[in-house]
């Protein structure tokens, strides 16, 4: 067995005696035995082995060493291999057996055994060599490894086997060694217990019976896991043990069940007994197949918001500290002006600073004149096709014509109260909170709204013009709320606050058609294409119900509107106002004046120049400088400089570019900064507000600043500009001001080079009340150090805008070149700069310190001769030699320890920096190290002595060049600081008038210049009258309205310039009109405009923006005459108005402008009525007592024979004056329960006699009779029903329904049955509370008998079911394309006519005549082609016959035109049918109709009409708008055009209304009104349900 390993017992035991070879064998350790190897030698004797054993050991040790330490595979980095033979070996067998191991001697005390695997590997590589070396084959037989553990059992259950293994690798056979002998694996039996048995299902059982007897049920069947069941851990069956299937039986009854309650609805009221409703339904499930219904209610109601409502009105009156609009007569013609001062109100795209409160129920923002007679917004069009109120900014909660006399009554006086509430007043908090609450709940888009101010205006007890005859009054309120960005208004109408809309109160409402001066409620934005709004029923009688109507707030009598559009503009205005109200916006403390020149600002150390406009932005070319803050104050002076046309910059002193006091904003502060305040105010027309709080500052008071400099090896430039050199070594007083307790000291140190010069290495300064500021060069690090109060300061924290040192009461500033300046409270500046390791020091002070300085910078008094004064007052001459200046002046200012301000280390004092042996080089005796360096220095310095001196002392020409640069720079600085611009003198405002010459003189002043050059730029049409060295005189004649911005520039002999940019106020007014600086001009001025066109106040008879047109004074004065009274433009009138009103209509008294109704009923001689008299506006009507009718003369009353009309007596009827009486036949008497019925006096047995209804004893004989409502038949016994409806025995005004023995009455749609149960009364749909039928602000609801219609207000017509201004382009149902007005228009000429006549009378006559001709033509030509392009049409073609037709005439824009002495008129016609169709009339048909009726048309207008033709291109107007829409409809539509015409028509209407009110009409109602408010260009109301409503609208 040749194995080697841990099983030592298997190795052959030694058979040779110990020490066979005579060697002493080392006793092996256990680890040696584990790692030993055996090898065999064939044909090798013991003796031979013994002889060569040492050689073997040496060979093997060398092999181990070579292979082990070469690749580090032995586990140690180094060692000495030693081969050991086991004791008793070799064993004498055949072959010879040797056992050995190898140890590695790591050091003297440590050896380790070589692992067997490593030894085997080595031996495998060297055996062949070993064989060759010893001449005999060395072989290693293979050896088994240990047995591995037995593996797992071969089966998981039941009997199995386990296997274990060993390998012949311990070692493997080497060099033909023998393989291992023996098995390589062993097995043994194993058993893991019984095997599991998986379960299996049985067969399914049969299905069970159905689980229910009705409806849907289930059947079931089962199976089990028992074939076989699972055992010994076997798996259970996989699958269902139960199966179900649906089975159907007859349906079962299903009882209904409620769903869950739905959510509660929105509360019906925001306060005071609101309700909420929630619902559920019986659908969970619904009852079915005979099941029971749900038991219980389907809805529930609960109370909500049961708290009391605040009154509809905000606090008002004297108890609310309101102001009372004075009752003076002036306020009957003018509105009271309320100035808002610093506040503004955004109103759509404009902002206003004043509000006009008018006693007749409106607020205005421009012009104080009262508009007496209301008209719906936007008002009618004028002759220029412009709406009347296009320039009127109006809020009208209830604009009406009132009695001015009621303001003078001692009791029940009309009053107008007003008050402004401010956010900044504690007393106003309650009203502000209420306003904020209202805005947030009615306008949810601004949940954080905070009002800045609120205006509350309350009108109380306004009476109609018929006061005191009519004592009904109106009270209402408007609330304006704004935060500066958003504006809202509330219209509040208290309960029973609105009692009248007509002069007759609530009597005879039908006498007042829409538009006849009735109250208007809404608003008008005042600019073309901006919103206007009319409340429902505005301008109609039914506006009087506004206090009972639900407003758009869901509250009765409360309406809410948003009144602005431009949020960006408004936001700026809001922020400007917020800024102005901050406490930080208060007037600033005294601040320094601005430097006069931009160069001074850049050099004055007290100012920071914001080149990049990082602080506050101005216009292009403008740069601002800021004074540095002092101490803890945040106020600084802002100075802004604008570009000059000729180059350079000049101080701006006019908005919006100018500066002013400026408050530095605190980081994170919520307040608005001054920079933002300027931007907000000047972008929202409020620049003046900003500059009122931040007034611009000129350079007046800016004084000369003088700069002294010490630099180089040291050279001094005194404050009187004397330059000398003093290179002492030590510490010296540079400048001292005793009364200000200011002193600056400096320290010198030797310069490099020859050691003959010094330079400043440190400086220190202090003022009374401040810390010391010390600067020094760190000699080790070579950089600049700063100490404040003796402590190092981090200079990286010093900024260019100034770093305040609160504890030191100083400000430090870093320049862009690295210089650091210390600013003291006295405005003294101390600047130090590191120049290549030396300090350059500058002292700068205002000229307040003249005659107060001493020290090495001399005495500042502008006299260089006395600069060298010693501390004891000795004067050294200014021309003294440098040596004398050094010893007799400079060294005298050396300081000692008691005087020093410096900071020293423990071993330092002033004497530390003094060397008594030091003798400097003097500047008058410069010596050079050699000529070549001298030549180099002269080349670099030129003749600059200071430069040459410093180069010679330091042996460095760059040092000298730096000295030269510092000196030159200081000279330039002093020159710039001393340079002041000329003062230009001229007008700041130039008032000019177009076409008129004006002369302007410009002069200048300067204290050191007597020569000036004047120029003027940007001024056309200018004539230079004189241009001398002292003044400029020009003449300017403005010839156009082109903007000019002149700039006057004056330049002095020092090339300094100033400019004057006057504000140009140009008056463009023509025809002697007057220019005014109104709100519009003020807004432009506030924006900083430098050229403004003034507004014009036109004298009577002129109009236009510049009063360039003559106008009708009637138009100018808002049609001042009483409605229906003709207004005539006259050159003059007795009252100076330039218009004249015709006399008041019959029935009125007054001056034609104000007409009061005459009560004819008060004088029986006038009215002559038989019975009673009813007074009407302008007239009266007689009325008769019941039972009488009015005769044709209108005054007499005639008895009505009731027995002939609707006789309701059962038997006999007798007519009486004013009535009738019923009586009975013999045997009957009047029924006490019914005075028209008869009952038997004596009854008999009806059964015996055989009577069907009644048996009566007549003269002792029984007779049959009938009840009321029946008639006795011919058989004398039976009764038949009398049909009262066919026999005219009923009193129904409309529909009669016969009943058995009686009848009932009913009404057609649109009527209600009156309490008498017979009469039908018309429903006024337009007056129904909270039920509007016409949509939008442009429609007016017109009540008709039994129905209503919706009409577009004047100036609009219906297109595509909406009211629009102009002819539409549509793609209607018929597929028509867009319509151009000119393509369907006719032109004709009216001879000998002008525009005045057209406006006064011809327009109405002409359009009425054309409308009549068109209707007659189309009716008479039923099959003709009248209908052209469809605007609103059916899908089929139909005939006109049997159709009501309305024609409307539309005049094109810019027509009529005046041509010679004639008028050219262009127009088209629109046709409306009662079928809801709207057409543009066919042009050919229109032309034919007019040509056939040319004579009729001429007769109708009393002017000759000629040249009727289709509109040609040459005739066309540039824009296809129409000017009006009038038509010939039913005659009553014309009522209200003129009071004079209207009065008799009103009387007829009253009579007809009373006589024929039973006539019914079928009505078609539109959908409910849905209030919409737009903020777009023009309100466009959108309709729904057109198919159901078009007939009613037309």
From Swiss-Prot:
Subcellular location: Membrane
Sorted UniProt keywords: Calcium, Disulfide bond, EGF-like domain, Membrane, Repeat, Transmembrane, Transmembrane helix
Transmembrane domains' residue ranges: 1531-1551
Membrane topology, record value: Single-pass membrane protein
Chain ranges of the VWFD domain: 706-901
Cytoplasmic side: 1552-1593
GO biological process: cell-matrix adhesion
Protein name: Mucin-like protein
Superkingdom of this protein's organism: Eukaryota
Topological domain spans for side Extracellular: 1-1530
A GO MF label: calcium ion binding
Domain EGF-like: 1063-1108, 1110-1156, 1157-1191, 1281-1321, 1322-1364
Domain AMOP: 568-706
Signal peptide region: none
Keyword field contains Amino-acid biosynthesis: no
Native species: Acropora millepora (Staghorn coral)
């Amino acid at each position: 067995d040749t194995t080697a390993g841990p099983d030592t017992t298997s190795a052959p035991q030694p058979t040779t005696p110990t020490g066979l070879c005579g060697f002493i064998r080392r006793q092996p350790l256990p680890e040696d035995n584990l790692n030993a190897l055996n090898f065999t030698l064939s044909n090798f004797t013991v003796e031979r082995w013994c002889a060569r054993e040492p050689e073997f050991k040496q060979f093997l040790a060398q092999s181990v060493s070579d292979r082990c330490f070469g690749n580090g595979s032995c586990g140690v980095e180094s060692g000495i291999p030693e081969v050991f033979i086991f004791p008793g070996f070799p064993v004498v067998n055949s072959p010879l057996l040797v056992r050995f191991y190898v140890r590695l001697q790591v050091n003297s005390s440590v050896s380790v055994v070589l692992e067997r695997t490593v030894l085997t590997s080595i031996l495998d590589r060297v055996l062949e060599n070993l064989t060759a070396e010893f001449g005999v084959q060395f072989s290693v037989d293979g050896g088994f490894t240990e047995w591995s553990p037995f593996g797992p059992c071969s089966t998981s259950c039941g009997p199995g086997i386990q296997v274990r293994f060993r390998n012949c690798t311990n070692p493997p056979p080497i060099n033909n060694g023998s393989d291992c002998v023996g098995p390589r694996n062993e097995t043994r039996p194993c058993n893991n217990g019984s095997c599991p048995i998986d379960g299996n299902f049985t067969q399914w059982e049969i299905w069970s019976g159905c689980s229910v007897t009705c409806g849907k049920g289930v059947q079931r069947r089962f199976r089990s896991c028992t074939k076989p069941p699972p055992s010994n851990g076997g798996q259970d069956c996989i699958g269902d043990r139960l199966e179900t299937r649906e089975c159907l039986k007859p349906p079962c009854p299903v009882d209904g069940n409620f769903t869950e309650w739905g959510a509660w609805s929105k509360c019906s009221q925001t306060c005071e007994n609101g309700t909420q409703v929630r619902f559920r339904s019986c659908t969970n499930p619904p009852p079915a197949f005979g099941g029971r219904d749900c038991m219980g209610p389907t809805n529930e109601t609960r109370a909500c918001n049961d708290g009391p409502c605040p009154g509809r009105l905000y606090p008002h009156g004297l108890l609310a500290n309101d102001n009372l609009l004075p009752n003076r007569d002036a306020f009957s013609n003018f509105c009271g002006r309320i100035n808002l001062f610093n506040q503004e109100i955004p109103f759509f795209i404009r902002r206003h600073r004043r509000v006009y409160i008018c006693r007749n129920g409106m607020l205005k923002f421009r012009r104080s004149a009262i508009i007496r007679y209301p008209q719906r917004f936007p008002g009618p069009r004028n002759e220029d096709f412009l709406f009347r109120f296009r320039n009127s900014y109006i809020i009208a909660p209830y604009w009406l014509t009132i009695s001015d006399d009621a303001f003078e009554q001692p009791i029940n006086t009309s009053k107008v109260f007003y008050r402004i509430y401010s956010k900044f007043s504690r007393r106003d908090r309650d009203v502000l909170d209420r306003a904020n609450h209202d805005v947030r709940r009615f306008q949810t888009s601004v949940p954080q709204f905070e009002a800045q101010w609120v205006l509350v205006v309350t009108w109380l007890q306004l009476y109609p013009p018929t006061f005191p005859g009519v004592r009904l009054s109106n009270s209402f309120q408007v609330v304006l709320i704004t935060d500066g960005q958003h504006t809202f208004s509330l219209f509040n109408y208290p309960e029973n606050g609105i009692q009248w809309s007509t002069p007759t109160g609530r009597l005879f409402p039908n006498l007042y058609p829409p538009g006849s001066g009735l109250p208007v409620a809404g608003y008008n934005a005042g600019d073309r294409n901006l919103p206007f709004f009319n409340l429902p029923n505005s301008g109609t009688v039914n506006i009087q119900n506004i206090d009972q109507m639900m407003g758009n707030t869901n509250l009765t009598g409360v309406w809410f509107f948003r009144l602005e559009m431009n949020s960006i503009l408004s936001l700026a205005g809001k922020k400007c106002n917020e800024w102005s109200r901050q406490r930080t916006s208060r007037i600033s403390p005294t601040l320094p004046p601005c430097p006069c020149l931009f160069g001074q600002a850049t050099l004055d150390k007290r100012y920071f120049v914001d080149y990049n406009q990082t602080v506050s932005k101005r216009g292009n070319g403008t740069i601002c400088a800021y004074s540095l803050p002092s101490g803890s104050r945040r106020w600084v002076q802002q100075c802004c400089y604008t570009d000059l046309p000729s180059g350079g910059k000049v101080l701006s002193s006019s908005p919006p570019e100018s500066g002013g006091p400026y408050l530095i904003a605190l980081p994170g502060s919520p307040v608005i900064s001054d920079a933002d305040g300027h931007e907000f105010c000047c972008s929202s027309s409020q620049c003046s507000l900003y500059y009122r709080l931040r007034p611009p500052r000129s350079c007046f008071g800016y004084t000369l600043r003088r700069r002294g400099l010490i630099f180089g090896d040291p050279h001094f430039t005194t404050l009187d500009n004397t330059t000398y050199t003093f290179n002492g070594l030590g510490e010296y007083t540079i400048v001292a001001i005793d009364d200000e307790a200011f002193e600056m000291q400096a320290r010198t140190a030797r310069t490099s080079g020859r050691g003959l010069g010094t330079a400043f290495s440190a400086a220190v300064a202090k003022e009374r009340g401040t810390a010391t500021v010390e600067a020094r060069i760190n000699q080790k690090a070579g950089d600049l150090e700063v100490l404040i109060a003796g402590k190092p300061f981090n200079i990286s924290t010093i900024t260019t805008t100034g770093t305040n040192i609160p504890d030191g009461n100083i400000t430090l500033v870093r320049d862009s070149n690295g210089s650091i300046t210390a600013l003291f409270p006295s405005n003294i500046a101390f600047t130090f700069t590191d120049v290549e390791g030396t300090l350059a020091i500058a002292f700068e002070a205002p000229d307040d310190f003249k005659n107060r300085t001493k020290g090495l910078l001399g005495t500042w008094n502008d006299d260089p001769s006395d600069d060298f004064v010693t501390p004891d007052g000795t004067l050294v001459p200014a021309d003294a030699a440098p040596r004398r200046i050094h010893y007799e002046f400079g060294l005298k200012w050396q300081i000692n320890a008691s005087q020093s301000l410096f900071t020293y280390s423990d071993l330092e004092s002033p004497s530390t920096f003094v060397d008594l042996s030091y003798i400097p080089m003097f500047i008058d005796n410069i010596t050079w190290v050699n000529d070549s360096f001298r030549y180099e220095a002269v080349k670099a310095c030129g003749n600059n002595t200071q430069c040459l001196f410093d180069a010679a002392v330091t042996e460095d020409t760059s040092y000298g060049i730096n000295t030269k640069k510092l000196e030159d720079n200081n000279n330039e600085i002093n020159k710039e600081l001393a340079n002041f611009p000329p003062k230009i003198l001229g007008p700041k405002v130039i008032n000019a008038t177009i076409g008129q010459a004006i002369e302007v003189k410009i002069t200048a002043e300067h204290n050191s210049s007597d020569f000036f050059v004047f120029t003027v730029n940007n001024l056309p049409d200018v004539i230079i009258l004189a241009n001398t060295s002292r003044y400029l005189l020009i003449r300017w004649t403005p010839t156009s309205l082109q903007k000019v911005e002149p700039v006057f520039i004056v330049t002095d002999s020092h090339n300094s310039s100033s400019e004057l940019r006057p504000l140009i106020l140009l008056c463009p007014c023509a025809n002697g009109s007057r220019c005014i600086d109104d709100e519009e001009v003020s807004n432009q001025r506030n924006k900083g405009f430098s050229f403004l066109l003034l507004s014009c106040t036109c004298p009577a008879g002129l109009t236009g923006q510049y009063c360039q047109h003559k106008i009708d004074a009637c138009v100018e004065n808002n049609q001042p005459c009483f409605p229906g009274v003709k207004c005539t433009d006259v050159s003059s009138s007795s009252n100076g108005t330039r218009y004249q009103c015709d006399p008041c209509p019959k029935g009125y008294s007054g001056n034609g402008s104000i007409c009061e109704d005459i009560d004819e009923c008060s004088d029986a001689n006038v009215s002559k009525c038989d019975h009673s008299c009813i007074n009407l506006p302008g007239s009266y009507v007689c009325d008769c007592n019941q039972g009488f009718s009015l005769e044709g003369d209108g005054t007499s009353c005639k008895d009505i024979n009731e027995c002939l009309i609707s006789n309701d007596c059962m038997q006999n009827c007798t007519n009486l004056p004013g009535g009738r009486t019923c009586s009975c036949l013999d045997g009957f008497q009047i029924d006490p329960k019914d005075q028209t019925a008869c009952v038997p006096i004596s009854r008999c047995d009806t059964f015996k006699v055989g009577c069907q209804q009644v048996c009566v004893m007549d003269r002792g004989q029984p007779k049959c009779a009938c009840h009321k409502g029946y008639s006795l038949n011919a058989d004398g016994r039976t009764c038949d029903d009398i049909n009262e409806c066919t026999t005219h025995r009923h009193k129904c005004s409309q529909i009669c329904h016969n009943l058995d023995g009686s009848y009932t009455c009913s009404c057609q749609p649109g009527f209600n049955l009156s309490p008498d149960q017979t009469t039908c009364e018309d429903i006024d749909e337009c007056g129904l509370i909270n039920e509007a039928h016409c949509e939008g602000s442009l429609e007016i609801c017109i009540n008709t008998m039994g129905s209503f219609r919706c009409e577009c207000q004047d100036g609009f017509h219906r297109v595509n079911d909406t009211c629009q201004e102009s002819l539409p382009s549509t793609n209607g149902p018929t597929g028509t394309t867009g319509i151009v007005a000119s393509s369907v228009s006719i032109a004709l000429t009216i001879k000998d006519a002008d525009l005045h006549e057209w406006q006064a009378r011809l327009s109405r006559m002409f359009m009425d005549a054309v409308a009549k001709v068109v209707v007659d033509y189309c009716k008479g030509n039923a099959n003709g082609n009248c209908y052209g392009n469809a605007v609103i049409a059916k899908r089929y073609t139909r005939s006109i016959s049997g159709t009501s037709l309305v024609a409307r005439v539309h005049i094109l824009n810019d027509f009529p035109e005046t041509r010679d002495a004639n008028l050219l008129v262009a127009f088209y016609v629109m046709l409306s049918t009662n079928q809801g169709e709207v057409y543009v009339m066919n042009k050919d048909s229109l032309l034919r109709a007019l040509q056939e009726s040319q004579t009729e048309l001429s007769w109708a207008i009393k002017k000759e009409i000629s040249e009727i033709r289709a509109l040609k291109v040459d005739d066309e107007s540039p824009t296809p708008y129409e000017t009006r829409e009038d038509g010939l409809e039913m005659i009553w539509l014309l009522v209200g055009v003129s009071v004079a015409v209207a009065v008799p028509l009103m009387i007829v209407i009253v009579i007809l209304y009373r006589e024929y009110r039973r006539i019914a009409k079928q009505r078609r109602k539109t959908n409910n009104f849905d209030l919409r408010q737009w903020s777009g260009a023009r309100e466009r109301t959108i309709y729904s349900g057109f198919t159901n409503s078009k007939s009613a609208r037309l």
